Amino acid sequence: MAPLLGRKPFPLVKPLPGEEPLFTIPHTQEAFRTREEYEARLERYSERIWTCKSTGSSQLTHKEAWEEEQEVAELLKEEFPAWYEKLVLEMVHHNTASLEKLVDTAWLEIMTKYAVGEECDFEVGKEKMLKVKIVKIHPLEKVDEEATEKKSDGACDSPSSDKENSSQIAQDHQKKETVVKEDEGRRESINDRARRSPRKLPTSLKKGERKWAPPKFLPHKYDVKLQNEDKIISNVPADSLIRTERPPNKEIVRYFIRHNALRAGTGENAPWVVEDELVKKYSLPSKFSDFLLDPYKYMTLNPSTKRKNTGSPDRKPSKKSKTDNSSLSSPLNPKLWCHVHLKKSLSGSPLKVKNSKNSKSPEEHLEEMMKMMSPNKLHTNFHIPKKGPPAKKPGKHSDKPLKAKGRSKGILNGQKSTGNSKSPKKGLKTPKTKMKQMTLLDMAKGTQKMTRAPRNSGGTPRTSSKPHKHLPPAALHLIAYYKENKDREDKRSALSCVISKTARLLSSEDRARLPEELRSLVQKRYELLEHKKRWASMSEEQRKEYLKKKREELKKKLKEKAKERREKEMLERLEKQKRYEDQELTGKNLPAFRLVDTPEGLPNTLFGDVAMVVEFLSCYSGLLLPDAQYPITAVSLMEALSADKGGFLYLNRVLVILLQTLLQDEIAEDYGELGMKLSEIPLTLHSVSELVRLCLRRSDVQEESEGSDTDDNKDSAAFEDNEVQDEFLEKLETSEFFELTSEEKLQILTALCHRILMTYSVQDHMETRQQMSAELWKERLAVLKEENDKKRAEKQKRKEMEAKNKENGKVENGLGKTDRKKEIVKFEPQVDTEAEDMISAVKSRRLLAIQAKKEREIQEREMKVKLERQAEEERIRKHKAAAEKAFQEGIAKAKLVMRRTPIGTDRNHNRYWLFSDEVPGLFIEKGWVHDSIDYRFNHHCKDHTVSGDEDYCPRSKKANLGKNASMNTQHGTATEVAVETTTPKQGQNLWFLCDSQKELDELLNCLHPQGIRESQLKERLEKRYQDIIHSIHLARKPNLGLKSCDGNQELLNFLRSDLIEVATRLQKGGLGYVEETSEFEARVISLEKLKDFGECVIALQASVIKKFLQGFMAPKQKRRKLQSEDSAKTEEVDEEKKMVEEAKVASALEKWKTAIREAQTFSRMHVLLGMLDACIKWDMSAENARCKVCRKKGEDDKLILCDECNKAFHLFCLRPALYEVPDGEWQCPACQPATARRNSRGRNYTEESASEDSEDDESDEEEEEEEEEEEEEDYEVAGLRLRPRKTIRGKHSVIPPAARSGRRPGKKPHSTRRSQPKAPPVDDAEVDELVLQTKRSSRRQSLELQKCEEILHKIVKYRFSWPFREPVTRDEAEDYYDVITHPMDFQTVQNKCSCGSYRSVQEFLTDMKQVFTNAEVYNCRGSHVLSCMVKTEQCLVALLHKHLPGHPYVRRKRKKFPDRLAEDEGDSEPEAVGQSRGRRQKK
C-alpha cells in the first residue's frame, strides 16, 4: 500500500539484498545506498503532490498520505467486519460503475442481507437467544424478487461526498495558479485544510442517520450454524435473526473500496481492479480477460515475453507510468510538444507499476522528470489528474500509439534500452539522452528522418485548417490544445498560459501562418506582452506622457463613435417614423386565426350583435344592474339564443334588465295598453315577452317622435336602430320570445339596447360619469400643482440658504479655527491638572453622566420625531394610493360609457376588438363594411378619411357599441400622413378569435412596424398586452352552462300560482267575494287552456268589490256637482259628461275582457292579469290594517274597518265599545255625520235638523265624488311627460275622506247666522259644532298645502324646470336684479313650504306665478328659457287640475316692454318682475 502520485500508485524501493541500509526513510523504511538518491526521494516526498488512496485527499506530502492510509487501515479493522469483505469485493471487482453507485449498492446489500460467516442472534422464543453463524443464503422466490426490486429502487441514500471529485477540484484550482516558493506557515494551513481525518465522519452523515430509517431486510431464508454446538438449522427467516454488530456506514464502505481497489484508467467506464492478494484470497471471479483488461499488467507478469518483444509498448513500465502521468498534466510539458501528433491513449492498470519487475528503478524515473521539467511544472504535473484528450480513446486502441511512441524513441536514441538494468548510475544516463529527444526544435527544422517518425506514428492532430509542415512544435501543440479545450471553462487559464508561451516563442511569420481563429488571439497576446515590456522599460515621465496620449486618443475615438452612433440612430429613427400603405409593404404573413365558436343554430355573422348586447349591459351595468347581479356573458347568451329549452330564464332575465330601465324613463311615459301605462303593469319573467312587444310597437315610436319634434332641443332624433320589423312583432303576438329564431331574438335585443340609449337615464348616467371624471382630473391637477409649488419653494429656500452659507462661511471658518485652537490650548493644561485631583474626577464623572442623559434624551426625541415622520409618510403614501386607485377607477368608468372603438386594423382592413371581461378574448372582425358606410379618403386633404360618424351611424344597425364603432383609427392615422391607398372590401361579416398567448406573440411579430395601420395596431396591442393576456386567460375558463327549463310549462305554472295568490289576497284582505280558496285552487290547477284561464281571470275581476277597484276598472256613477246648482243647463251638461265617462269605463273594461278572451300567449295573459292586480286597491286590505287607537295588529275577528276612511279599530278600543261587528256599512266616530254623533250622544236639536240633513247629504255626495276623482287621478295625466311616482298614490289613499272633501256650501250661512246680534244665545251643542267645523276647515287647509308641496316636488323634478330651480346669481346675469325687483324661484318656494310660511293655496300660487312672470319680463322672445317656462307652467296647470280642482290657475301674461323701457322703468313697474337663469341672457 502506497500513496498515489496523480492517479497512479508510486512503487516503493525494494529492500537492498544482504546489505545494511545506509540511508533509510523513516515512515516507508525505504533504504538507499547513496545520499543523492535519498535526498532526491525525500525532496519528492516532501512536496504536496501526493494523494491518499484510501480517502482521496489530495495536496498532501507523502508522509501525510502514508499516515492517513495507515489510519484508514486501522479504522477498517475496527469498523468493517471481515464477513463483509468478500461480499463487497465481489461487487467491486471489474465493475465499471462510479464510486458512489458502488458504495450505494454495497451498502444496500449489507443492510438488506446477512453475509455468509456473519455472527448474529437467533430468536427462538420471546426471551431466548442463540448465538449462530450464517452458513448459506437461500435465493428469493420470484414473487419476492420482484418485490425486493421495487424496494431497492426506492431505497433512500444517506448523504455523502465524493472524494475523487473533491480531489480533482482541488487539483484543478492548484493548476490554474503558478506555484512559487511558499511559506512554511501557508503550507501548514493548506495541509490542515486538505487533511481530513477518516475517523471524523461528516456531520451531514450523522444528521442523515437521524433523518431516515434504514432499509428493511429482504425475505431471504438462511442456514445457520450454532456456535456452541455443531448443528445447522435450515430455512431460518430473516425476521428471526438479530444483528449483534453494527454494519458499516457508507463512509466506511467508501474507505474500504478505495483502500482495496483502484480504477484502471480515467474514463467514466474504466473498470475497478481489486488487489491481487485479495483476488487470490477470496477467489474473486474475473469479468474480463486479463489481457483485455490490463495488457501492461499482463506483460509485467510475463517478463520473458517482454524481453523478447523489444518493440512492445511496455518495455519500460516505469517510463510508461511517467509518460501517462505527464500526458494528464499541464500542457506546458515540453515532452508533449514532440509527440503532439501522436494518438493519445488510456493508461493501463494502476497496479502495474507496483507489480512490475522492470529493471528501471524509480530513482531514474524521478531523475528524468526533474531534469525535464522546472519545479513549477512539477506541481501541476503530478497533483492535477484530469480527463484530458488521452481519455477519449479507451480500450484496445491504446496499443498502437504506444508502440509507435516506443519505436520512435528507440530510433531517436540510436540504441535499445534494456529495461532491466538495476544500477542507478546507468539509469541516470538515459535521461540525458532523452533530454536531446525532448528538445525537438532542431528536429523540426532538421533531417527528414526526424520529421518522418512522428508523421508515421500517428499523423498530425485534427484541426479545422491543417497547419503547415514547418510550423514549430509550440504552434502545433497550441492548435491541438485549443481545439480540444476551447469550450471548457476549467481549462481557460491553462489555455491562456499556452497562448502566452506560444506568443513569446513564435516569430511574426509563424504567427501569420496560424489559423485565423488562433492568429488574432496570439497576435493580441504578443502585442500585450510587447506593451508590458515597453512599459517596464519606461521612466515615470514617459509613462505619464504615454497615458496622456492614450487617453486623448481614446476620447477622440469615443467621440467619433458616439457621433457615428447618434447619426445612425437618427437615420434609423427617421426611417422607422416613415409610414407606408400596408399592402404595398412586404413582410411576414399574418397568422390564421380560428372562427369564434358559436352554438349550432347561431351563425358566426351574428356574433357582433351578441357582443354588442353583452358589452352594452357591461358598460352600463351601473345603470342597468345597480344591485350587482350576476353579469351577462357572451357565451351564456349565445347558448340561450340557440337553446330550445334552456334559454327561457336567461333570455327573459336580460329582457327584464333592459325593460326596467326603459319603462321607468320619461321616454316611456306614453307607452300604454288599454288605457294603462306599461310602467304600471308588473314586470316579471313571465310578462316580459308581451311587454317587449308593446314597447317596440311602431305606434309608440311614432307618437314619441311626433311629441318630441315640438321640442327645441335635439333630444328627439329619429333612430331606425330602435325599431323592429313588423313580422317579428306579429310573431310575438302568437308565440313567446324564447320560441323565435336566434336572428329574431337578437334583432329585438339590439333594438331594445338602442331604444335605451335614447333615454334620459342614459344621458344623465353619461353626464354623471363625465362630471366625475372631470372632478377627478381637477383634483389631480390641483395636487400636482401643490406638489410643484412645494418643490419650487424648497428649491428657492435651498438656494437662499446656500447663498447665505457662502457669504458667512469664510468668516465663520476663520473664527472657528482660531477658537478651536484657543480652546485646545486652554483645555489641555486643565485636563492635566484636574486629572491629578480626585474631586475633579468625581465632577467629570457627574458631568459625563449628565451629558449621557442629555444625549439619551436627544436620541429619544429624535427617534420619536423619526417615527412620527415615518407614520406621516406612510399615511400620505396610503392616501396617495387610494386617490390614485379612485382616479383610475373613475376614468375607467367614464371611458366605459363612451363609444367603444376597435384597437386598430391590419393590412387587410380587418378590425381588432378587445371587449370587457364578459366577452373575453381578442377578436378579429372581417367584412365589417356594408352599404350604409361611406368609406372614402382624399389625397389632398389630410383631415378626413371617413365622411364622419354622423353620416352613417344612424343608418348602421350596429353603430352605437360593440360591433360597428366609428373608424377613429383610420381617421387618426390619416391626419399625420395621408398614405392610405386601399379601402376595405365588402364581404361576409365573420369573427375570428385569438385565444392563446403564442398566437398573440406571433401576431405582434408579423405586424409591420411601418405600415400606416399595422404600426398603430402593433403599438396599441403592445400597450394593452397585459389586458389582452388577462382576457385570453378568462376565455379559457369553462362555462357553467344554463339551467334547463321548459318555458311553456314555467309560464303555465306561474299563471296558476298568480291566480291563486290574487284570489287568496282578495279573500284575506276583505276586498272581494271569492269562493272557498281550496275549491278555487283545485279548479285553477285543473286548467290547461288559455281560454279557460281567461274566463277564470274575468270571474276573479267580477268578484272584487267595486269600491276597491281603481284605474280604468273603477265605477264612475257619481260626479262632482258644480257650485251653481240652480242652473238646469249645467246639470244637463253634467249628466251628459257622466254618461260619457260611464261609457268610457264600460268600454275600457270590455276591451280588457275582449283582450283576455283573444289572448294567444301566456305572457299576454300574465300582462292582463297584472292589469287587474294594478287596478285593485291593495292598500285597503285588512291584512295591512293596524288599530288606530292601540297601533297594534292581530285579532282580526275583533278588527273593524271604517267604510269611509278605511282605518281599522278594535271593537274593544272604541268608545263606547262594540261587542259585535255591526251589519251593513260602518263609519268611525271621526267620519260619522254631526247629527249622527249628536244623536248617539243623546242630544236633540230639532231646529237645525232639516238644514243639517241637507248639508250632510250634499257633503256626503260631494266627498264620495271627490274620492272617486282621486282614485283615478294617477291614471289620467293631462299630456304630461313625468316619470311615474307610484308612492304618491299610496299616500293619497290613506288620507281621510273628511279631509279630502271640498268647500261645503252650508258653512257660510251658519257663520252668518252665528254672527247676527239678535241670534239666540249659543248653547254647548252649537259650540261643539263650531269647534268641529273649525277643525275640519283647518284640516282641509293643511291637506291642501301638503298637496301644494307635492305639486312643487313634481315640478322641480320636471326636466324643463331647470332654469327656475335656484336663485339667479350676479355671475350668471349682472343686470338681473336691475330688471327684476321681486325675484322668486322654486328653491325659495320649497323653503317657505317647509317652514310653514304659506297659510293658503292662493299664497303658494302667487309665488309660482311670480316665477313665470319674472321669466317673461327678463327673457327675450324666442329664448330657450321662455319655452321651458311655457312647458313648466302647463305642467303646473295640469297638476293643479288633477290634485286641487277647486283652485283655478289664471295668470295674466305681460307684454314685453322694449329693452330700454324695461331697463329704465323696471323698478317702477309693479308687475314687470320675473326670474330666469342667468345663463340665458338678453340678446
Curated annotation (Swiss-Prot):
UniProt keyword annotations, A-Z: Acetylation, ATP-binding, Bromodomain, Coiled coil, DNA damage, Isopeptide bond, Kinase, Metal-binding, Nucleotide-binding, Nucleus, Phosphoprotein, Transcription, Transcription regulation, Transferase, Tyrosine-protein kinase, Ubl conjugation, Williams-Beuren syndrome, Zinc, Zinc-finger
Annotated positions of the Phosphoserine modification: 152, 158, 161, 330, 345, 347, 349, 361, 374, 699, 705, 708, 716, 947, 1315, 1342, 1468
Tissue: Ubiquitously expressed with high levels of expression in heart, brain, placenta, skeletal muscle and ovary.
Domain DDT residues, every copy: 604-668
Glycyl lysine isopeptide (Lys-Gly) (interchain with G-Cter in SUMO2) cross-link, renumbered residues: K826, K853, K1043, K1089, K1107
Annotated Basic residues bias: 384-395, 423-432, 1282-1292, 1301-1316
Residue spans, zinc finger PHD-type: 1184-1234
Motif mapping: C motif: 207-213
Catalytic activity: L-tyrosyl-[protein] + ATP = O-phospho-L-tyrosyl-[protein] + ADP + H(+)
EC number assigned by the record: 2.7.10.2
Chain positions with N6-acetyllysine modification: K1335
InterPro entries from the UniProt entry: BAZ1B (IPR047174), BAZ1B_Bromo (IPR037375), BAZ1B_PHD (IPR047256), Bromodomain (IPR001487), Bromodomain-like_sf (IPR036427), Bromodomain_CS (IPR018359), DDT_dom (IPR018501), WHIM1_dom (IPR028942)
Enzyme class: transferase
Co-factor(s): Mn(2+)
Pfam assignment, any one: WSD
Biased composition (Basic and acidic residues): 148-165, 172-195, 788-810
Compartments reported by the entry: Nucleus
Domain WAC residue range list: 20-126
Cross-link (Glycyl lysine isopeptide (Lys-Gly) (interchain with G-Cter in SUMO1)): K826
Domain Bromo: 1339-1443
Function: Atypical tyrosine-protein kinase that plays a central role in chromatin remodeling and acts as a transcription regulator. Involved in DNA damage response by phosphorylating 'Tyr-142' of histone H2AX (H2AXY142ph). H2AXY142ph plays a central role in DNA repair and acts as a mark that distinguishes between apoptotic and repair responses to genotoxic stress.
Similarity remark: Belongs to the WAL family. BAZ1B subfamily.
PANTHER family per UniProt: TYROSINE-PROTEIN KINASE BAZ1B
Name listed for the protein in its UniProt record: Tyrosine-protein kinase BAZ1B
